[in-house]
């Protein structure tokens, strides 16, 4: 069984940020400590990250990028079409991966069953083995600290990496800033 990662997405006042740790584990063994499981897509206007089976996630990334192209960059339309395709395809329903996607307007969690979930607060979502730790830390920092969006994501993932054995503190982030 692969236990692979923690991904955190945060849509702040001036920036959207996605971050992930670098650990990939198989059973009780760390296979890799510097994997990159986040991407910039659609000319850097959309951020995406995955947790779960790596091969499955790459297939999902490719499919999602195609949907985003067909939707001309409209993230909401792309996630809805992606979800429809996922639920109709017997092969896709067996994929063991989840994705987070966001731009400056929206943030979505795409589940392994084809569900599309927009976080209740509309700004913070996390997936993966350390996702609940990162989500808790991000909510607390968002509520009580006045820090930069990217720093919030890095600190939250670091906290998750200190608690979850399937998450490390080799953090990578991507940022989309408001156009000036």
From Swiss-Prot:
EC number assigned by the record: 3.4.25.2
BP term (GO), one: proteolysis involved in protein catabolic process
Catalytic activity as recorded in UniProt: ATP-dependent cleavage of peptide bonds with broad specificity
InterPro entries in UniProt: ATP-dep_Prtase_HsIV_su, Ntn_hydrolases_N, Proteasome_sua/b, Proteasome_suB-type
Keywords: Allosteric enzyme, Cytoplasm, Hydrolase, Metal-binding, Protease, Sodium, Threonine protease
Cellular compartment(s): Cytoplasm
Annotated Gene3D superfamilies: Glutamine Phosphoribosylpyrophosphate, subunit 1, domain 1
Organism superkingdom: Bacteria
GO molecular function: metal ion binding; threonine-type endopeptidase activity
Active-site residues annotated for this sequence: 5
Regulation: Allosterically activated by HslU binding.
Subunit structure: A double ring-shaped homohexamer of HslV is capped on each side by a ring-shaped HslU homohexamer. The assembly of the HslU/HslV complex is dependent on binding of ATP.
Family of the protein in this entry: Belongs to the peptidase T1B family. HslV subfamily.
Record's function text: Protease subunit of a proteasome-like degradation complex believed to be a general protein degrading machinery.
Protein name per its UniProtKB record: ATP-dependent protease subunit HslV
Source organism of the structure: Campylobacter curvus (strain 525.92)
Gene: hslV
């Amino acid at each position: 069984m692969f236990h692979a990662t923690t991904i955190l997405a945060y849509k702040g006042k001036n920036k959207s940020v996605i971050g992930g740790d670098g650990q990939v584990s198989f059973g009780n063994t760390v296979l890799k400590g510097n994997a990159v499981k986040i991407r910039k897509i659609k000319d850097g206007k959309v951020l995406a990250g995955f947790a779960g089976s790596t091969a499955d996630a790459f297939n999902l990334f490719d499919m999602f990028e195609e949907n985003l192209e067909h939707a001309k960059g409209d993230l909401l339309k792309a996630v809805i079409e992606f979800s429809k395709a996922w639920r109709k395809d017997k092969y896709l329903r067996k994929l063991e991966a989840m994705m987070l996607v966001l731009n400056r307007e929206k943030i979505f969690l795409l589940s392994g069953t084809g569900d599309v979930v927009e976080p209740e607060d509309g700004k913070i979502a996390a997936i993966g083995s350390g996702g609940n730790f990162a989500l808790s830390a991000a909510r607390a920092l968002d509520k009580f600290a006045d820090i930069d969006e990217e720093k919030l994501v890095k600190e939250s993932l670091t906290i998750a990496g200190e608690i979850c054995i399937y998450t490390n503190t080799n953090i990578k982030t991507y940022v989309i800033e408001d156009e000036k």
